Amino acid sequence: MWFSGKKEQTIISLFFKHIDKVEETLKCVFDLIKKYLEDTDDIESLYLRTQRLESEADRLRRKTEMEMYSGAFLPNFRGDLLGLIESVDKVANKAEYVADLIVLQKPEVPHELKDLILSQMEYSLKAYESLKSALKFLFEDLERVEEFVLAVEKYEHDEDAVERTALRKLFEMDIERSVKLEVKELIRSIGDIADRTEDVSDRAEIILLKRRF
């Protein structure tokens, strides 16, 4: 680890806790989606857990930011890290939004699209897991960061391909327009999780380049 100060170590520990909590949020939303697509009514507990996890992630973000304002890190890196934290939190925000869509709107997802939507979420989760590794290696082993940045790009690309297929199938279906629009929003929003994950990965790559040069 290339930071040894006590303040810096505290912040890095909080940062790791934050990215872990966001991963918990994503996994909970994935479980909620699976339950919903299985036509079960038992999603309320998962919805409440999603809200709790996202709130915990938010508190960790704020705590990390407050610690950073105490003067830890050089100003340039401090700004980069703040940007990372905010971007990671947006991933959790979008995941919670997906849960809101499902619980509040209850979109009528056609059977033909269920596996595609699950694949979207699987790729989004794999992208985030790769991102988490990239972010941890950013502080532990810079040489390992790039392989996980590339993995994020791959999984985001895979998700995007599934998303396009799902949307194409959706609009070929003979169903009510209102249903199409609700399902479209769900598909797009899951895609946004992968997109936001890649946005964080791009920030990590920029920090990597700065550290190298």
Swiss-Prot record:
Pfam family, one: PhoU_div
InterPro entries noted in UniProt: DUF47 (IPR002727), PhoU-like_sf (IPR038078), Put_Phosphate_transp_reg (IPR018445)
Protein origin, superkingdom: Bacteria
UniProt similarity note: Belongs to the UPF0111 family.
Name of the molecule in the record: UPF0111 protein TM_0914
The organism of origin for this protein: Thermotoga maritima (strain ATCC 43589 / DSM 3109 / JCM 10099 / NBRC 100826 / MSB8)
